[in-house]
Amino acid sequence: DASFDLTMSIFGAMFAPRPFDVAREMVRVTRPGGRVVMGNWIPNDPSFISQLLRVSSAFSPPPPEGFISPMLWGVEDHIVERFGKAGVERASISTTRETFRFARADRTPADFIEAFRRFYGPTMNAFEAAEKNGRQDDLYRELVALAEEHNEAKDGGVSIPATFLKVTVCL
């Protein structure tokens, strides 16, 4: 309890199944005067990750009853509610839109999607579901086209921006 000066989760804790517990635990382990910092993807954003998740969900089965979308961590009102229930006042919570850039000079957009296919839970699940329906190639083509559309690299490689919500909670 109250052990850390900084508790940070970048695109991680947002995927935990019980968001109010996540906020409470992050507050619990952070000392008074410390900070909780999160980076969370934003729902319905036109940037890459939000669109990748939209495409992936179209190939996935519906979520189970009671499922709370991790994308709600990208909505300020939900953040305020979650940390508020953990005892944090609204004035101690700030959010800003920031950009994360996926950049690799030695990779193509197709390589990039292949990495997401193997290592990123939402796309792994979408590919598993698409394979069962014989639509794996459709999903792959759609995601590669999306990566190519968002790729800003001028001389080959990958440079894909993705907007996220930076959350700072001062305790």
Predicted segments, located by residue:
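A short, conserved alpha-helix within the catalytic core of class I
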Residues: 16-26
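A short acidic, Gly/Pro-enriched loop at the edge of an enzyme's catalytic core
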Residues: 1-7
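Core SAM-dependent methyltransferase catalytic element
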Residues: 86-89, 110-113, 122, 160-171
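Short catalytic micro-motifs in class I SAM-dependent methyltransferases
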Residues: 11-14
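Conserved catalytic/acceptor-binding region of the Class I
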Residues: 20, 31-107, 123, 132
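C-terminal helical/coil "lid" or tail adjacent to the Rossmann-like core of SAM-dependent
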Residues: 90-154
